[in-house]
């Protein structure tokens, strides 16, 4: 079938936007026409597959030129423009949290719930999950299918890049001796901040509740999810300490086998040789979700699994890669 993929990328010059371009190139997506869109960066140039494109103004752009758009410019931009794009017959992949919790908006990790794409009958908005959720669920979904997870506790150790360019710049400046604190409530360099996003009335942060809401929407609405989200002085790569309670017993060898059979998972689990994933070693424009430190215990007649998960939160499964995989699914399912 001869199809034209006419793609707009909103937020093309941002941290994630630039990584989306890299993923498009690496996965050799055949795009007929590409339109980077922005606001303050209008007129700047973006390169894709050795061709240069000027960033165009979102406000004045002719929507009839495109049939697919990726929004990577935050909730405010998505709220203002995304539904207008959909009304013009354009599929929208949104990386912000704006529409993730709307009941009829599919929240998609292709390896887990591609059926959400298959059943689409007309152009719509598709939400990309939270970066911490994507890597978590890719790793634990095969365990849930096999062993029935009935409780999840996760502590995230989230990189500065997850907050964007200003946060990275402030982090680098602090490392150089500048004491300005603007992006986070406290200094991040040489520190650990047990707060990602704002606090809610229940004393959890919004980021912590996102993990619960999105896990239940994608994986299973009946699983209790408890999380603590921590910002750490790491430029890139989110890490997670995960504790799972399961209905059924298992062994470490069985967990290894399940994960080795899972697309997108790379198992690194050899404690005798100090071999386990770290963001410094493994979150460098990597597509895989890395899993290690697996332990299986029986505590008070309950079955528990502990593990450590690392992924590139910008290039990888947490953001750019998952968005492009959704685009690939739309193409492969003849939706565009």
Segments predicted by a language model, with ranges:
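N-terminal Rossmann-like NAD(P) cofactor-binding subdomain of oxidoreductases
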Residues: 1-188, 224, 289-290, 294-300, ...
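Charged docking surfaces used in two-component/phosphorelay signaling
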Residues: 69, 160-336
């Amino acid at each position: 079938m001869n199809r034209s993929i006419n793609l707009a990328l909103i937020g093309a010059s941002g941290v994630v936007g630039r990584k989306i371009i890299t993923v498009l190139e690496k996965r050799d997506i055949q795009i007929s026409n590409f339109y980077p869109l922005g606001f303050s960066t209008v007129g700047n140039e973006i390169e894709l597959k050795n061709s240069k494109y000027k960033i165009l103004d979102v406000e004045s752009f002719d929507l009839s030129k495109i049939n697919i758009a990726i929004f990577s410019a935050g909730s405010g931009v998505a709220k203002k423009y995304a539904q207008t794009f959909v009304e013009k017959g354009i599929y929208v992949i949104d990386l912000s949290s704006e529409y993730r919790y709307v009941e009829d908006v599919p929240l998609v990790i292709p390896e887990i719930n591609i059926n959400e794409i298959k059943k689409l009958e007309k152009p719509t908005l598709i939400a990309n999950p939270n970066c911490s959720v994507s890597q978590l669920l890719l790793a634990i979904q095969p365990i849930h299918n096999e062993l029935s997870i009935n409780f999840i506790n996760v502590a995230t150790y989230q990189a500065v890049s997850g907050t964007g360019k200003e946060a990275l710049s402030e982090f680098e400046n602090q490392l150089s001796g500048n004491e300005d604190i603007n992006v986070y409530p406290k200094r991040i360099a040489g520190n650990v901040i047990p707060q990602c996003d704002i606090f809610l009335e229940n004393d959890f942060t919004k980021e912590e509740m996102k993990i619960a809401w999105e896990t239940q929407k994608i994986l299973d609405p009946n699983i209790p999810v408890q999380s603590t989200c921590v910002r750490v002085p790491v430029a890139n790569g989110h890490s997670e300490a995960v504790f799972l309670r399961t209905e059924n017993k298992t062994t470490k060898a069985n967990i290894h086998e399940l994960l080795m059979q899972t697309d997108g998972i790379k198992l690194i689990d050899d404690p005798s040789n100090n071999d386990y994933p770290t963001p410094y070693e493994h979150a460098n424009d990597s597509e895989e979700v890395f899993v290690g430190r697996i332990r299986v215990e029986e505590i008070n007649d309950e079955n528990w699994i502990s593990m450590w998960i690392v992924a590139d939160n910008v290039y990888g499964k947490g953001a750019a890669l998952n968005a492009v995989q959704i685009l690939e699914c739309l193409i492969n399912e003849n939706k565009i």
